[in-house]
Swiss-Prot record:
Organism name: Aeropyrum pernix (strain ATCC 700893 / DSM 11879 / JCM 9820 / NBRC 100138 / K1)
Annotated Pfam families: Ribosomal_L29 (PF00831)
Protein name: Large ribosomal subunit protein uL29
Keywords, alphabetical: Ribonucleoprotein, Ribosomal protein
Molecular functions (GO terms): structural constituent of ribosome
Keyword Ribosomal protein part of the UniProt annotation: yes
A biological process from GO: translation
Membrane-traversing stretches: none
Any single Gene Ontology cellular-component annotation: cytosolic large ribosomal subunit
InterPro entries associated with the record: Ribosomal_protein_uL29, Ribosomal_uL29, Ribosomal_uL29_CS, Ribosomal_uL29_sf
Domain of life assignment: Archaea
Family: Belongs to the universal ribosomal protein uL29 family.
Length: 71
């Protein structure tokens, strides 16, 4: 995962398995960023914010896909 905004449009094109894999990777990255922020090593605080928002985007798309399967 690079330092970029994930687009919801791109995420909607991914399968549930791909989204879950990406979510796991992002959560691990987010954990590392939080650690760096805590010890003062985080160079770009915006990266932490962007990672949190990317996690939220993925969770939103996953919820939409799962609700779509039920309907």
């Amino acid at each position: 995962m690079g330092k970029f905004k994930m687009r919801s449009k791109d995420l909607r094109g991914m399968s549930v398995e791909e989204l879950e894999k990406t979510l796991r990777e992002l959560r691990i990255k987010l954990m590392g960023l939080r650690y760096k922020a805590k010890v003062g090593l985080l160079e770009n605080p915006g990266e932490l914010r962007e990672a949190r928002r990317n996690v939220a985007r993925i969770l939103t798309v996953l919820r939409e896909k799962r609700e779509g399967e039920k309907a």
